[in-house]
């Protein structure tokens, strides 16, 4: 069974703790690259349980500062997609907000700038 198919467990009607436990069980066999790709996919698809999935992936050992392809970190990607719940979750889990993507702008500055502009 594919990893993404295992995530399609029925989560409606479960408590937050039960959702986190079920998602964690589904992701147990995934490596960091697979976990990061799943996070990227749930951001792209605006999955309603994305915060639980991000928390489960980090609880399984994925660094909140994991670098995706093309030199984007998870936080960069969430900021680029303007995904506030994932941004907050990554920051709460310890993502480096002081890393500078460009010479004079931190992640937090870019996020604030995006919010103000839109």
Swiss-Prot record:
The highest taxon in the source lineage is Viruses
Query: What does the UniProt keyword field contain?
Result: ANK repeat
ANK repeats span 70-99
Q: Which residues form a coiled coil?
A: none
Q: Which InterPro entries does UniProt cross-reference here?
A: Ankyrin_rpt-contain_sf
Q: Which SUPFAM superfamilies match?
A: Ankyrin repeat (SSF48403)
What name is this protein filed under? Putative ankyrin repeat protein R747
Organism whose genome encodes this protein? Acanthamoeba polyphaga mimivirus (APMV)
